[in-house]
């Protein structure tokens, strides 16, 4: 289309103002107009310039407004992440300007599934017109031109779209359909990218589906750390959206619940970091009785139910993704699990620094739910025994093993404090201080270990750790012989 064609003086009411980045700084409005008018008549182009320079220089980006929404979307589909302009290293970035986001198409666009293949666009319009003004209606068709039994409907406001969902979703079963009509918001670009990531993971997981953690691990070495990063990214996105079904479909994650998936991701990150140094490997393989920590929690092969996945197998798959399978055996896999609850003074003494770094890295990778996820793979008997004796107690450990924790969440109790600091060693006491007048937490407390090494591990990993809107401050409690206050 050429910009010289007849057009009104003003753009359409639904026209979109687009922001365009990765534009050569030497390009003028005229150069840009020639580029954009291939897709439709251009109403206005505004190059962003640095006014501090004389004369003002282009910042390499601009705003463009087409006369029609259709032209803007066609330009975006053809240029965004697709075309690299002369002299640039990255493709054009083209998206609606911030001022357009409040009424973005993706917020008003519905996907309609399970519709009769006999329906036309007009039939769909009639069906949904009672909920508000329809901006666009399109039935998806195959190469043969026949309907695929689904459509997209875009309303002029999000409220109209929400009303349509409430009224029409699963409200009727149409002719030739096996289940009720599906009405939901169409996938956004972010949703599509998330599904693409899940597909990539699924393909990689298929490579290891025939391998057994109890047998030959050599076949798992084909995967690298980038797939662990991909998994963590997908986990974070799905956790924030509350949709962990995507992960549940991945082998061998299918039988794990959300908390188990989160724990395994943290453990794999910790093991990957620790395995990169000799001392870290020692810390993994020398933890006392690590296999019992897993097997006593129902993780042995014989105790796995038919509808669940062995946590050790899942752990092995994640360790594989971290590129750390060379020379591993069942003991070393269990040793990695010990990072999440079995580390005592013997494990830390053979690689304290690197293990602390590994734990810190694991926590920071999934910080929004790490604190809640800590106890899941612990030896439950050990957890119960420690809980009875340590929660609420003010018993002190040896010199250098007693911690003062500030900035605890208001709702944290003794048990929460205990569970949060158990991964670093044997806790002899954990106490949150309560205001006697209000009976509410003072948001600080004490934790004591049976050895100073565990206390140092807790400080390095948990000092600055964010829980909600708060960052913990963890430091050693001062000696009784020190006259200074806490």
Curated annotation (Swiss-Prot):
N-acetylmethionine: residues bearing it: 1
Keyword Acyltransferase included in the entry's annotation: no
Modified residues (Phosphothreonine): 4
UniProt keyword annotation of Transmembrane present: no
Region (Disordered): 277-309
Lineage top rank: taxon: Eukaryota
Consequence when changing residue 63 to L: Does not reduce RNA-binding. Abolishes ARE/EDEN-dependent deadenylation
Subcellular location: Nucleus; Cytoplasm
Residues bearing the modification Phosphoserine: 179, 302
Induction profile: Up-regulated in myotonic dystrophy pathophysiology (DM).
Post-translational modification: Phosphorylated. Its phosphorylation status increases in senescent cells.
A Gene Ontology term for the protein's cellular component: nucleoplasm
Entries under Gene3D superfamilies matching the protein: 3.30.70.330
Domain RRM intervals: 16-99, 108-188, 401-479
Entry-linked InterPro entries: CELF1/2_RRM1 (IPR034196), CELF1/2_RRM2 (IPR034198), CELF1/2_RRM3 (IPR034199), Nucleotide-bd_a/b_plait_sf (IPR012677), RBD_domain_sf (IPR035979), RRM_dom (IPR000504)
Tissue specificity: Ubiquitous.
Biased composition (Low complexity): 284-309
GO BP: embryo development ending in birth or egg hatching; germ cell development; mRNA destabilization; mRNA processing; mRNA splice site recognition; negative regulation of cell population proliferation; negative regulation of gene expression; positive regulation of gene expression
MF-aspect GO terms: BRE binding; mRNA 3'-UTR binding; mRNA binding; mRNA regulatory element binding translation repressor activity; pre-mRNA binding; RNA binding
Keywords: Acetylation, Activator, Cytoplasm, Isopeptide bond, mRNA processing, mRNA splicing, Nucleus, Phosphoprotein, Repeat, RNA-binding, Ubl conjugation
Homology family: Belongs to the CELF/BRUNOL family.
Assembly information from the UniProt record: Component of an EIF2 complex at least composed of CELF1/CUGBP1, CALR, CALR3, EIF2S1, EIF2S2, HSP90B1 and HSPA5. Associates with polysomes. Interacts with HNRNPH1; the interaction in RNA-dependent. Interacts with PARN.
Job description of the protein: RNA-binding protein implicated in the regulation of several post-transcriptional events. Involved in pre-mRNA alternative splicing, mRNA translation and stability. Mediates exon inclusion and/or exclusion in pre-mRNA that are subject to tissue-specific and developmentally regulated alternative splicing. Specifically activates exon 5 inclusion of cardiac isoforms of TNNT2 during heart remodeling at the juvenile to adult transition.
Protein name: CUGBP Elav-like family member 1
Organism this protein belongs to: Homo sapiens
């Amino acid at each position: 289309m050429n910009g010289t064609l007849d057009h009104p003086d003003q753009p359409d009411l639904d026209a979109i103002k687009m922001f365009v980045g990765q534009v050569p700084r030497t390009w003028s409005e005229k150069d840009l107009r020639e580029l954009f008018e291939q897709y439709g008549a251009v109403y206005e182009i505004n190059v962003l310039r640095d006014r501090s320079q004389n004369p003002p220089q282009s910042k390499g980006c601009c705003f463009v407004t087409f006369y029609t929404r259709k032209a803007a979307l066609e330009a975006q589909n053809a240029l965004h992440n697709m075309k690299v302009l002369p002299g640039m290293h990255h493709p054009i970035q083209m998206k609606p300007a911030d001022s357009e986001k409040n009424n973005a198409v993706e917020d008003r666009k519905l996907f309609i599934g399970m519709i009769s293949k006999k329906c036309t666009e007009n039939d769909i319009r009639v069906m949904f017109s009672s909920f508000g003004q329809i901006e666009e209606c399109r039935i998806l068709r195959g190469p043969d031109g026949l309907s695929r039994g689904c459509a997209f409907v875009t309303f002029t406001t999000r409220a109209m779209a929400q009303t349509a969902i409430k009224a029409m979703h699963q409200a009727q079963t149409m002719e030739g359909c096996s289940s009720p009509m599906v009405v939901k918001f169409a996938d956004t670009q972010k949703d599509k990218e998330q599904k693409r990531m899940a597909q990539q993971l699924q393909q990689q997981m298929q490579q290891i589906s025939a391998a057994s953690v109890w047998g030959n691990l050599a076949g798992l070495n084909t995967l690298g750390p980038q797939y662990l990063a991909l998994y963590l990214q997908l986990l974070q996105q799905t956790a924030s959206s509350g949709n962990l079904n995507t992960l549940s479909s991945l082998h061998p994650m299918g039988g794990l619940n959300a908390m188990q998936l989160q724990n395994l991701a943290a453990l794999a990150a910790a093991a990957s970091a620790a395995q990169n140094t000799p001392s870290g490997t020692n810390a993994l393989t020398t933890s006392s009785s690590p296999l019992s920590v897993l097997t006593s929690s129902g993780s042995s092969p014989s105790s796995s139910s038919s509808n669940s996945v062995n946590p050790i197998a899942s752990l092995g798959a994640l360790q594989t993704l971290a590129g750390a399978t060379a020379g591993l055996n069942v003991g070393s896999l269990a040793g990695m699990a010990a990072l999440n609850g079995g580390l005592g003074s013997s494990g830390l003494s053979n690689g304290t620094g690197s293990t602390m770094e590994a734990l810190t890295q694991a926590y920071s990778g999934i910080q929004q739910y790490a604190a809640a996820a800590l106890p899941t793979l612990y030896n439950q008997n050990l957890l119960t025994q420690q809980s009875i004796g340590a929660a609420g107690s003010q018993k002190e450990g040896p010199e250098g093993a007693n911690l003062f924790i500030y900035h605890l969440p208001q709702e944290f109790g003794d048990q929460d404090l205990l569970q949060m600091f158990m991964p670093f060693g044997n806790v002899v006491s954990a106490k949150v201080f309560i205001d006697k007048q209000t009976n509410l937490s003072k948001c600080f407390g004490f934790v004591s270990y049976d050895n100073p090494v565990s206390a140092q591990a807790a400080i390095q990993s948990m000092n600055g750790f964010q829980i909600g809107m708060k960052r913990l401050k963890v430091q050693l409690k001062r000696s009784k012989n020190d006259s200074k206050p806490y």
